[in-house]
């Protein structure tokens, strides 16, 4: 503590309320040990100074005590804060770890919530997209159904008008009547006038689906280079103007251009006898009205001329020729000029012979149901498939193994080659047609060249004379050394042989050995040999031998009676002798050379021929049944493909 001044110490030593005489009687305490002389004046001054000093000292002590208390309180607070800080420092690490753990847990929970929310949003978006796509598909189907119903109704109206209205001039064609006067006319006139009113409404309020179809059609025509009377940009701008009018009904006006009408509206305009020349009839050119006449096959509908009497070529005629492919057609201009060929990839238009089983096209006055079916069957020609070398080699190997594929084999082959089932089927159809043509041409060339040995090898079989016989299938089946050909191969070999021999009325082998038959003798059940020149396809040695045999037969017929006048026993004995001679000669030829003989020998007997004919008929019936089953399977496949499309 600080030292007190002398007067404070004196005041502290003496009581506060002490009498002044006490200080006066002790001069040493006041003077600091130095005695002073006592006088009355000095004593009074000393008493006053002592009282003032005592009062000041009391306040100073109070201040000092208050400051000391404040300092002690501050020290205590600092000590408490230090103690609190030390105790808090001891517990700091577990609090931080717990806080970190809680933060990590909160972050993980928040991340999970975000993921769940995002997944839920994705699911909702997918559901919304699916619902929107489904709604759009339903709307499109409804529009197509509505469009088809409108076309059906229009065709029914056309047929009704064609049956009940006269084909001549219609006096009410150019004069629309108010609705309250329609009841005073016959039903035919009433239908015509009602159709006119519907046309006016459709002209003023075109359907947006019709506008979209027409826009796509014009773009396709412009893209494929078809001639448009006028600038294509004007057509597209006009279509946009009409679509703008469709969205803004207050902009509609009855005197707009008719260039953007759909094929349905053009059919309605061309089929009825209505007032479809109420717009732009005063124009002197044909390009200001109905510029949809881009197809030359349907250029006779709605061409406007300057003369009002011939303002419409189809007025009152009842002939509702629809633009771009007939009344039942729904194809565009570029599709109407193309039809399917044998190399297209469609599966619905070909049978096994490469012929069209669905004939495209429709007549203007046919049945409405047939129009609809033909319009649905008519498709745009697809591009030819570009097969790779590997695909072609695999297809050729498969075709060598079997000429006809089952549905399962065809699907497996298509999956192996990464092709569609339709492409494999079309390739097989075309390849079968080519194979039949090549087989027929090859056999014809062999027959013309006289190479009957190669002809017999092509047929196959162990017995030479039976291999050349048309009924070689049963003989080859009976032969222990020859492989049994399939019924399909037998059928096509015989068909190719018939084509090579120009489809003669006699068996093919009869033409081979007819030159070796003895003169004046005929085979049982067969007519006499034809005159020289009856076998134009034989050449070289065979042609000369046939001519010599025919001339010798004619000379001997003059010397001997005809074979028909002989008795049955004589003819049978002669036949048996000829058979023995021919059998011995054929056996000698087989011993001399291993190649097939040029003269194969006699044909089988009557009983064997009958058996062969019966077996051949049975085989032909089996082949026909198999082909019918194949066609049914193809038709089922086509129906399945049509349903999938």
From Swiss-Prot:
Keywords annotated in UniProt: Developmental protein, DNA-binding, Homeobox, Nucleus, Phosphoprotein, Sensory transduction, Vision, Wnt signaling pathway
Coiled coil: none
Organism: Drosophila melanogaster
Protein name, per record: Homeobox protein B-H2
Biased composition, class Polar residues, residue ranges: 329-339, 583-592
Modified residues annotated as Phosphothreonine in this record: 593
Tissue expression as described in the entry: B-H1 and B-H2 are abundant in the eye-antenna imaginal disk. Expressed in R1 and R6 cells throughout larval stage until 30 hours after puparium formation, at which time expression is seen in the anterior and posterior primary pigment cells. Coexpressed in embryonic glial cells, neurons of the CNS and PNS, most latitudinal anterior cells of the developing notum and the central circular region of the leg and antennal imaginal disk throughout larval development.
Modified residues (Phosphoserine): 595, 602
Compositionally biased residues, Low complexity: 18-29, 122-134, 275-316, 362-377, 553-574
